[in-house]
């Protein structure tokens, strides 16, 4: 029969797969166009290095680190539309343009106060997207009136919480940690989780 590749061989192979292929696979499982999309980020814990490595660098405790996932999430189909993975701390706004460039949103973008920026709202208006982004607490009454006049609704905003449910479902089904040591191995690992999540929902759609 056929020889089964070892785990290390599979890990080496996934590193060689270019990013555009992972993006294409994710899009094929999520669809091409999305009406209402939420944006947010979450963290995946990373396995600690070996005891000998920790001892060699004179550390008494394990090294705390995590991988950050920023994502766009279709609140209607509950699927992940686009993702960005980082292994170093970054502000949520760093990956917004990257994600929006890879996603065709037809109606609404939901986001929490971490995404409250004038340039992002203007970008959404240019793309004919309605931004439902919660304003910061220190916003002036005048600016708040402007935002409300342009379509912001507290009732609609609550749909943003669906992306948090999506992150929770992703971690429950496929684990909240990653075993890769660098971004080249962590990226495909998280992409696989998101793709598997989308496929499981697609299977439910087909057979129900």
Task: Describe the function of each predicted region.
Residues 1-9:
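Short, basic interhelical loop/turn and adjoining N-cap
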Residues 11-15, 19-127, 135-136:
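Polybasic low-complexity intrinsically disordered regions
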Residues 90, 160, 189, 193:
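Electropositive phosphate-/nucleotide-binding environments in soluble metabolic enzymes
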Residues 93-96, 167, 192:
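A general structural signal for well-ordered alpha-helical segments in protein cores
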